[in-house]
UniProtKB/Swiss-Prot annotation:
CDD domains: ZnMc_adamalysin_II_like (cd04269). Its cofactor is Zn(2+). The keyword Protease applies. Snake venom zinc metalloproteinase-disintegrin that causes hemorrhage by provoking the degradation of the sub-endothelial matrix proteins (fibronectin, laminin, type IV collagen, nidogen, and gelatins) and disturbances in platelet function. The recombinant cysteine-rich domain interacts with the alpha-2/beta-1 integrin (ITGA2/ITGB1) (collagen receptor), and inhibits the platelet aggregation induced by collagen. Binds 1 zinc ion per subunit. This is Zinc metalloproteinase-disintegrin-like atrolysin-A. Pfam families: ADAM_CR (PF08516), Disintegrin (PF00200), Reprolysin (PF01421). Ca(2+) 2 binds at residues 212, 215, 217, 219, 222, 225. Ca(2+) 1 binds at residues 9, 93, 197, 200. PROSITE patterns: ADAM_MEPRO (PS50215), DISINTEGRIN_1 (PS00427), DISINTEGRIN_2 (PS50214), ZINC_PROTEASE (PS00142).
């Protein structure tokens, strides 16, 4: 089945050798890196991952860590610097160091395995090893693949080209495609580690690379971005322009269907009890109106309870929720135990001290139920107390663990009537 859409908020750091390699031309370096990110994004679309560049740092005044040709040593320093420096300045999911140094042992890149979202280890190092942008982009996509749990392809792994992205050796004609093995490794990583940081969609204003219509990232100046006209599945979006069609009224919401407002009168939030009011679409908005309910204190469930914030709390339902079927509310004698203040039998706690219930408040403390043939069953946890708003006597409800007159309980203290 199709994987959930995920977003990698990426920071790329170009070291000082990159700065000198491109003769200090920042515009040229930026353009080179934007091109790399666009390619990485295309490579990851089949995995339903979008890669958003949220920061680009060029070490124009000198390296901020010791960059050496020993890739593993440099990578470790970069991870430490990310924790103590970069993450404090800019929230992001993954950082890649792009270096113009010649890494040892024919290494073109290095990254730890399955570390996405880890503060120190969600990193990679990539050598700017070729004048062909695609080759550098595939290398960075490969290292990012390691962070996402993908190991090198073996002979039994296949994609539609001779060598796939996670091939151990980069070919001169590299592949855009992940193998079946890589896809399985990524799925396993997501299931086992469930990395949270790549679930949130980046803000338009966080993406620093120039907007690209069709990359499925919502960027500044775009109203929508559903991919290429061939793959777009959003009927509201014109894939060619990344603008909404002129007839579109809405894109999403409880009162939005097929890009139009749902007609007035369609229920969008059913009443959850006789104390709640069903809300219907207005025909003018994609949002369901604010949740409204009947006034607090209105009798409900054949006078067994009084409405409280859209519900009708009664002791029987609370007993049922705690103990299941074959329950009844315990006799009054059980509730009298709440006058003791011992153990869990009280109305309130003040500074850790149990305050016993007054005689008239006993049905607002610990809840007692008869379960099968057991009398006075109770739970010691907080959910074993009688709920606020529960009827405790005729014309009375529990408020602040006291059994008070229903008209007093719900009288507005601000002088305004309650909505």
């Amino acid at each position: 089945e199709r994987l959930t859409k995920r977003y990698v908020e990426l920071v790329i750091v170009a070291d000082h050798r990159m700065f000198t390699k491109y003769n200090g031309n920042l515009k040229k370096i930026r353009k080179w890196i934007y091109q790399i990110v666009n390619t990485i994004n295309e490579i990851y679309i089949p995995l339903n991952i979008r890669v958003a560049l949220v920061r680009l740092e060029i070490w124009s005044n000198g390296d901020l860590i010791d960059v050496t040709s020993a890739a593993n040593v440099t990578l470790k320093s970069f991870g430490n610097w990310r924790v103590t420096n970069l993450l404090r300045r800019k929230s992001h999911d993954n950082a890649q160091l792009l270096t113009a140094i010649d890494l040892d042992e024919e290494t073109l890149g290095l990254a730890p395995l399955g570390t996405m979202c880890d503060p120190k280890l969600s990193i990679g190092i990539v050598q700017d090893h070729s004048p062909i942008n695609l080759l550098v982009a595939v290398t960075m996509a490969h290292e990012l693949g390691h962070n996402l749990g993908m190991v090198h392809d073996e002979n039994r792994c296949h994609c539609s080209t001779p060598a796939c992205v996670m091939c151990a050796v980069l070919r001169q004609r590299p592949s855009y495609e992940f193998s079946d093995c890589s896809l399985n490794h990524y799925r396993t990583f997501i299931i086992n580690y469930n990395p949270q940081c790549i679930l949130n969609e980046p803000l338009q204003t966080d993406i620093i690379s120039p907007p690209v219509c069709g990359n499925e990232l919502l960027e500044v100046g775009e109203e929508c971005d559903c991919g290429s006209p061939r793959t777009c599945r959003d009927p509201c979006c014109d894939a060619a322009t990344c603008k909404l069609h002129s007839w579109v009224e809405c894109e999403s919401g409880e009162c939005c269907q097929q890009c139009k407002f749902t007609s007035a009168g369609n229920v969008c939030r059913p009443a959850r009890s006789e104390c709640d009011i069903a809300e219907s679409c207005t025909g003018q908005s994609a949002d369901c109106p604010t949740d409204d309910f009947h006034r607090n204190g209105k009798p409900c469930l054949h006078n067994f309870g009084y409405c409280y914030n859209g519900n009708c709390p009664i002791m029987y339902h609370q007993c049922y929720a705690l103990w299941g079927s074959n329950v009844t509310v315990a006799p009054d004698a059980c509730f009298d135990i709440n006058q003791s203040g011992n153990n869990s039998f009280y109305c309130r706690k003040e500074n850790g001290v149990n305050i016993p219930c007054a005689q008239e408040d006993v049905k607002c403390g610990r809840l007692f139920c008869n379960v099968n043939d057991f009398l006075c069953r109770h739970k010691y946890s907080d959910d074993g107390m009688v709920d606020h708003g529960t009827k405790c006597a005729d014309g009375k409800v529990c408020k602040n663990r006291q059994c008070v007159d229903v008209t007093t309980a719900y009288k507005s203290t601000s002088g305004f009537s309650q909505i």
